[in-house]
A protein has these predicted regions:
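N-terminal pre-triad scaffold of radical SAM enzymes
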Residues: 1-45, 62-71
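Short, solvent-exposed beta-strand edge segments and adjacent coil->beta transition regions
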Residues: 4-6, 52, 59-61, 81, ...
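Short, conserved beta-strand segments within well-ordered enzyme catalytic domains
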Residues: 8-10, 56, 115, 142
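Fold-independent oxyanion-binding glycine-rich loops
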Residues: 11-14, 24, 66-67, 87, ...
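Hydrophobic packing within well-folded, soluble alpha/beta domains
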Residues: 18, 40, 50, 69-75, ...
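Iron-sulfur cluster-binding cysteine motifs and their immediate structural context
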Residues: 19-26, 45-63, 74-89
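FAD-binding FR-type
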Residues: 60-61, 67-68, 89-95, 99
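Conserved AdoMet/S-adenosylmethionine-binding subsite of the radical SAM
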Residues: 94-204
Length: 204
């Protein structure tokens, strides 16, 4: 996710729905309850803790009624094996930067820095403020993006991005719509724009 030793900040929310998404929990903007079946010992702690009856045991297996789940995290707190986990939490720029700055000596020694990933990190308005804060602290910045964004969003981020890690999923527009859920026209237009401006790009 960029040169040297880096801290990757994953931001939730994505406007694509790629079949092969490696971080499907990052597609929605809000926190989500994740269940790891291989970690579950069927102790029933989560069932007893859920006030909504969203966690149930049927045929010897744990099931989650997503329509009833409040994503409160009560089940995850009592799970002894980590089979239940909340993915995503709200953090301020200051809180994120506190974590990022912990590894600043490693960035300086290795030529590393911070990488924003996701999801599509630039969908979050606070992403530019986070990039700016990193730059103000002398930290190299990279953004992993699919580029499916209004051009003005990219333009706002550009002054604070040292490297764009640009994910081109598919060149054929019809196939892109089929496997990613959206056209690639804007993605390729934004890529051409970045290339013309001389922005540092790594196309993947």
């Amino acid at each position: 996710d960029g040169p040297g030793m880096r801290t990757t900040v994953f931001l939730k929310g994505c406007n694509l729905s790629c079949f092969w998404c490696q971080n499907p929990e990052s597609q929605s903007t809000g926190p989500e309850l994740m269940y790891f079946k291989n970690k579950c010992i069927h102790c029933g702690c989560c069932i007893n803790e859920c006030s909504q009856g969203a966690v149930q045991l049927a045929n010897g297996e744990i099931y989650i009624q997503r329509s009833s789940c409040l994503t409160c995290g009560a089940c995850a707190k009592v799970c002894p094996t980590g089979a239940m986990e909340i993915s995503g939490r709200a953090m301020s720029i200051e809180e994120v930067m506190q974590k990022v700055l912990e590894d600043k000596p490693f960035y300086e020694l290795s030529g590393g820095g911070v990488t924003l990933s996701g999801g599509e990190p630039l969908l979050q308005k606070s992403s530019v403020a986070l990039l700016k804060a990193a730059r103000q602290n002398g930290i190299h910045t990279a953004v992993e993006t699919a580029g499916n964004l209004p051009l003005e969003v990219i333009e706002k981020a550009m002054p604070f991005v040292d490297l764009f890690l640009y994910d081109v999923k598919c060149m054929d527009d019809d196939l892109h719509k089929k496997v990613c859920g959206a056209s690639n026209k804007r993605i390729l237009q934004n890529l051409k724009f970045l290339a013309k401006t001389g922005a540092e790009l790594c196309i993947r």
